[in-house]
Amino acid sequence: MRITNVIADLVKCPLPAPFYPTWGSGLQFDSVKMTIVQIETDEGITGIGAGPATGWENVVGINTFLKQQLLNKDPFMIERLRPAISNAKLRMGWPWMVEAALWDLVGKACGQPVHRLWGGFANEIPVYASTGELCSLEKRIQYVQNCVDQGIQAVKLRMHDPHPENDLETIREIRRIFGSRIKLMVDANQADHLPGASDIHSSWDLPVALKVARALEKLDVVWLEEPLARHNYDGLAALARKVDIPIAGGEKNSGLEEFRTLAERDGYHIIQGDCVFSEGIFQLRKAAALAEAHHKQFIPHTWSNPIGLMTNLQLAASLPNCPWFELPYEPPAWNLDIYTIIFEEGLELKEGRIVVPDRPGLGFKLKEGFLEQNRVPHDPQQWMVR
């Protein structure tokens, strides 16, 4: 089998309502933007992967540089092709969707979902509903009640108020109302806060992170996510030593060397690599093994796009150290209907657990006509896409 073509397209899928991400510095998203890559072969099998699309950088990088590196190559030799994919970071944003497409192709050729090719571990994984917006306490209480009614066992809340005590009051009230009926995780989204950076919420230092972590311990929170900048290894390790609450992060760390450092320095009890933002899916499988060797959990981050979620689900289902799966859920903008718009089959949830699809490859099939209906024509004069 040989690769005969590599095609990248920018795709916009409209959302049912505007989405205001906590991590987006006041941005409004009216659609899900994806770079979708298709890798075709001489045997008629096509692999599909997807990554971010802030502009045309990924499309151009794949259709020019990476395409030339992959043509006429054996798609099963992914480790041999991986250096070219990794080096593409110099020419584009996130090239990891290309490795995902290769594994999708291999799984289809073998007639097996990718997680089974790697030995397989889980057919179902408990989900936690992951919030993505800020809202009033009343709306968040209704959100949690909605999750409980659906059988979802856990919710991740965001801390983005300039005064962390205000966020803590919200978390205290939700804990008071729901008690042990729901598990709570908390995401501070501080990993991108580098020296001199500014955003819509304040940057934490170690004393602030320590104060918040100790307050969350009293509320029986499962973990505190990204309380400090991602490369502040000393600060993260110092925080982890001083508190009992597990510290989580790693969604945009990249390279086995960084994940080895995260595992060895003990700054994170839970590592959260992402097949869209961090690394290729099999490289993250190696990172998860590093985490396992250091008695840590590896729970992929999945807030990106629906194809990215399905890719991370295949990774998670292959891991013995992945007790939870992140389910992005912020209705009305981001609800489960989006998966039925993009895929022939939507996500299957059963008693608070996501069912891992057994369809060959990455477990999904795009709806007929989806690409044609949502493809954005390439305008060389327009770099950003809104």
Annotated model-derived regions:
Residues 68, 73, 229-357:
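Shared catalytic-loop signature of beta/alpha-barrel
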Residues 97-135, 181:
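Glycine-rich, aromatic-flanked loop segments that form ligand/cofactor-binding clefts
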Residues 3, 44, 98, 111, ...:
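Conserved, mostly hydrophobic/aromatic
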Residues 1-18, 25-34, 305-386:
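Flexible C-terminal active-site loop/helix
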Residues 7, 40-109:
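Metal- or metallocofactor-binding catalytic centers and their adjacent structured scaffolds
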Residues 35-39:
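Short beta-strand scaffold segments in enzyme catalytic cores
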Residues 49, 127-130, 155-157, 184-188, ...:
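Hydrophobic faces of well-ordered beta-strands that scaffold small-molecule active sites
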Residues 124-243:
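Metal-dependent enolase-superfamily TIM-barrel catalytic cores that perform enediolate-based chemistry
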